[in-house]
Amino acid sequence: NPCCDAATCKVRTGSQCAEGLCCDQCKFIKKGTVCRPARGDWNDDTCTGQSADCPRNGLYG
């Protein structure tokens, strides 16, 4: 993984993340970017811009 230092098993300097639905090229994806499309009555899940995780919004459409 180009975002990680294999010797230390930590994210490289200048990188924000190494994996996750809201991580792209070692950086957090912009807030509001859809990371999990709506299914059924649920709304889209979107990135926060602060984490590589894709949080469930828990809201119905």
UniProtKB/Swiss-Prot annotation:
Domain of life the protein comes from? Eukaryota
Sorted keywords for this record are:
Cell adhesion impairing toxin, Disulfide bond, Hemostasis impairing toxin, Platelet aggregation inhibiting toxin, Secreted, Toxin
A single Gene Ontology MF term assigned here is: toxin activity
- GO cellular component, as recorded: extracellular region; plasma membrane
Checking InterPro entries in the record gives: Disintegrin_CS, Disintegrin_dom, Disintegrin_dom_sf
The listed locations are:
Secreted
In this chain the Disintegrin domain maps to: 1-61
Q: Which cysteines bridge via disulfide bonds?
A: C3-C26, C17-C23, C22-C47, C35-C54
**What does UniProt note about where in the body, tissue by tissue, this protein is expressed?**
Expressed by the venom gland.
Instruction: Return the PROSITE patterns for the record.
Output: DISINTEGRIN_1 (PS00427), DISINTEGRIN_2 (PS50214)
Record SUPFAM superfamilies: Blood coagulation inhibitor (disintegrin) (SSF57552)
| Record SMART domains | DISIN
Cell inner membrane: is it a keyword of this entry? Answer: no
Positions occupied by motif Cell attachment site:
39-41
| PANTHER family linked | ADAM A DISINTEGRIN AND METALLOPROTEASE DOMAIN (PTHR11905), DISINTEGRIN AND METALLOPROTEINASE DOMAIN-CONTAINING PROTEIN 28 (PTHR11905:SF32)
- Any extra remark in the record? The disintegrin belongs to the medium disintegrin subfamily.
Described by its record, this protein's role is as follows: Inhibits fibrinogen interaction with platelets. Acts by binding to alpha-IIb/beta-3 (ITGA2B/ITGB3) on the platelet surface and inhibits aggregation induced by ADP, thrombin, platelet-activating factor and collagen.
Family classification: Belongs to the venom metalloproteinase (M12B) family. P-II subfamily. P-IIa sub-subfamily.
Subunit structure, as described in the record: Monomer (disintegrin).
- This one is known as Disintegrin viridistatin
What is the species listed in this Swiss-Prot or TrEMBL entry? Crotalus viridis viridis
